[in-house]
């Protein structure tokens, strides 16, 4: 549930389904279908190139009352709608690609703080004072990216990186052994208050960080 709506990433059908009244009754059809022109279609990126209203592998959702974020892992990006959509429409916000038509997998080499390789999870947390933090599991780069505040369209890259020595590095377990500050294919995460939990799938463990 994000805000008052219940959202489901229907990954294999390349769409996100939304129920505006919260948890639906059994067999209740969705009120909103994002990523496809109708409830019967299921093509990757609507059968064409990536755009602001398409998905390849939508895998996770987060947000708040007036914002929905979707981790579109297959297009190596995070899409955002503000306010939350009440019908199929293009996204307003974009992270991980230079424009809405981009879906390039960054080549395996030195990386940056504003590109992803298969971001499978995203989480936005708001503190009692109204401040926000955003976390993205940049899965194939074996790292977690963090922003102080919700970045806007065209804003700079992440403020912090976990599990790598710098933004350019992306090795599995830092190309060393499994350690307390390494990750191998982080696949899920949850950010609440001062605690970040990460499903470190390649190392068969869950890692916890506490902000000090």
Question: What residue ranges belong to the model's regions?
Answer:
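Short loop/turn segments immediately following beta-strands, especially the blade-tip
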Residues: 19-28, 81-89, 147-156, 209-212
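Short loop/turn segments immediately following the C-termini of beta-strands
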Residues: 11-12, 21, 73-74, 83, ...
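Structural signal for beta-propeller blades
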Residues: 14-16, 76-78, 142-144, 204-206
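Conserved beta-propeller blade signature
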Residues: 5-8, 67-70, 133-136, 195-198
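Signature of short aromatic-glycine-proline-rich micro-motifs recurring in repeat-based ectodomains
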Residues: 1-3, 46-64, 108-125, 174-194
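Beta-rich catalytic cores
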Residues: 12, 54-57, 74, 90, ...
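Surface-exposed loop and turn segments in beta-propeller and other repeat-based domains
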Residues: 28-52, 90-113, 157-180
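Blade-level signature of beta-propeller repeat domains, shared across WD40, Kelch, NHL, RCC1
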Residues: 142, 187-212
């Amino acid at each position: 549930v994000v805000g008052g709506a219940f959202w489901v990433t229907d990954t294999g059908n390349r769409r996100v389904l939304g129920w505006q009244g919260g948890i639906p009754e059994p067999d209740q059809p969705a009120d909103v279908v994002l990523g496809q022109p109708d409830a019967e279609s299921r093509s990757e990126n609507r059968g064409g190139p990536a755009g602001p209203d398409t998905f390849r592998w939508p895998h996770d959702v987060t947000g708040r009352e007036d914002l929905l974020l979707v981790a579109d892992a297959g297009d190596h990006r995070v899409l955002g709608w503000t306010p939350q959509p009440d019908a199929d429409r293009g996204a307003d916000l974009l992270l991980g690609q230079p424009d809405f038509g981009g879906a390039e997998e960054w080549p395996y080499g030195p990386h940056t703080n504003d590109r992803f390789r298969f971001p499978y999870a995203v989480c936005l947390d708001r503190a009692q004072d109204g401040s926000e933090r955003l976390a993205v599991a940049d899965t194939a780069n074996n790292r977690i990216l963090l922003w102080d505040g919700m970045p806007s369209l065209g804003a700079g890259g992440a403020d912090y990186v976990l599990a790598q020595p710098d933004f350019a590095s992306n090795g599995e377990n830092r190309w060393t052994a499994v350690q307390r500050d390494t990750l191998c294919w982080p696949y899920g995460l949850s950010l609440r208050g001062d605690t970040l939990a990460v499903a470190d799938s390649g190392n068969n463990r869950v890692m916890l960080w506490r902000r000090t």
